[in-house]
Swiss-Prot record:
Its main location: plastid. Belongs to the bacterial ribosomal protein bL20 family. The gene is rpl20. InterPro entries: Ribosomal_bL20, RIBOSOMAL_L20_CS, Ribosomal_protein_bL20_C. Binds directly to 23S ribosomal RNA and is necessary for the in vitro assembly process of the 50S ribosomal subunit. It is not involved in the protein synthesizing functions of that subunit. This is Large ribosomal subunit protein bL20c. GO terms for cellular component: chloroplast; ribonucleoprotein complex; ribosome. One of its GO terms (biological process) is translation. NCBIfam families: rplT_bact. Keywords: Chloroplast, Plastid, Ribonucleoprotein, Ribosomal protein, RNA-binding, rRNA-binding. Pfam families: Ribosomal_L20. It comes from Cycas taitungensis.
Length: 115
């Protein structure tokens, strides 16, 4: 059986990984083995944090809606319950944007729902 040295294919693979790690600090961008490990770690973190971002943004929207609702004398819990009761549940992201950008519109929404 003949020996396979993998010449340019191995070089191409290493260059690709080092190019991915080019923005990393210190040896993590210079040495292949550490760059390879850091690439795996970076991709794991990116995958985990894509799910975490969804959770964090939902918490932020709920906090903003709660703050705006309490300024109008209603808790978040009651506000959402009335929205469900009237079958008007809108997107929490949209409600949070309305609460932040247009306070008068949000207060009219609350007044119309809670009657």
């Amino acid at each position: 059986m003949t020996r396979i040295k993998r010449g340019y294919i191995a070089r191409k693979r290493r260059k690709k990984i080092l190019a991915f790690a080019s923005g990393f600090r210190g040896a993590h961008s210079k040495l292949f083995r550490t760059a390879d490990q850091q690439k795996i770690r970076a991709l794991v973190s990116a995958h985990r944090d894509r799910s975490k971002r969804k959770r964090d943004l939902r918490r932020l929207w709920i906090t903003r809606i709660n703050a705006a609702a309490r300024n109008n004398g209603v808790s978040y819990n009651k506000f959402i319950r009335y929205l469900y009761k009237r079958q008007l549940l809108s997107n929490r992201r949209i409600l949070a944007q309305i609460a932040v950008l247009d306070k008068n519109c949000f207060s009219t929404i609350i007044n119309n729902i809670i009657e």
